[in-house]
């Protein structure tokens, strides 16, 4: 179903409307959470938001993946693309940084935490929720991708007003470790043999690792 009224809007108006829709979604997420929090406490509210995010993050990732026409396993490049199109991508100041074979995603200014702080409410202990959210999203984009929390309340290494997550493909990291060990062994063999077998060792290292 398409809303014919949307077709009449300019690009700028559509961008404004997307921001409004995103804020509305986040407002709904917040009001039902606070309703449970007031009646049953923080632990009960966190339980229900975890259950919701387990399902929602997969749905969101699947639709974004289809929209971007990503292949089955698009790697960290595909994940980086998809992260920018999440609802939160329209709400929070965020950045993606590539560090070798890892992708760092950092929320600089989380609307949820800043709003709670502004209202005098305690910070939302969202690390457990974030683990389901980001792990599930990444695995839906590419089943090989793993996720590790770098900073998220209450386990913050950075500002509690944001969070940071590291994504990586486990096989590639294990392969790098194995390759590093093999190179180390080859260099050790080179030193041990000195000039006697040096050219052969160098040749083998170059052939094995494409140097």
What are these regions (language model features)?
Residues 1-104, 109-129, 136-164, 170-211:
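N-terminal accessory segment detector
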């Amino acid at each position: 179903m398409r809303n014919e009224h949307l077709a009449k809007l300019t690009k700028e108006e559509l961008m404004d409307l997307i921001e409004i829709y995103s804020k509305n979604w986040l407002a709904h997420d917040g009001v039902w959470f606070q309703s449970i929090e007031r009646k049953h406490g923080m632990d009960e509210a966190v339980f229900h938001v975890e259950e919701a995010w387990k399902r929602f993050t997969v749905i969101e990732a699947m639709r974004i993946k289809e929209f971007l026409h990503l292949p089955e396993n698009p790697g960290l490049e595909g994940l980086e693309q998809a992260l920018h199109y999440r609802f939160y991508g329209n709400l929070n100041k965020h950045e993606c940084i590539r560090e070798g074979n890892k992708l760092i995603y950092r929320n600089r200014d989380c609307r949820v935490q800043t709003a709670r702080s502004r209202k005098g409410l305690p910070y939302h202990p969202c690390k457990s929720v974030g683990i389901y959210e980001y792990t599930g999203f990444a695995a839906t984009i590419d089943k090989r991708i793993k996720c590790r929390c770098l900073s998220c309340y209450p386990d913050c290494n950075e500002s509690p007003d944001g969070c940071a997550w590291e994504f990586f493909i486990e096989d590639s990291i294990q392969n790098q470790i194995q390759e590093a060990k093999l190179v180390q062994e080859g260099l050790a063999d080179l030193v041990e043999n000195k000039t006697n077998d040096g050219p052969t060792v160098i040749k083998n290292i170059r052939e094995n690792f494409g140097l």
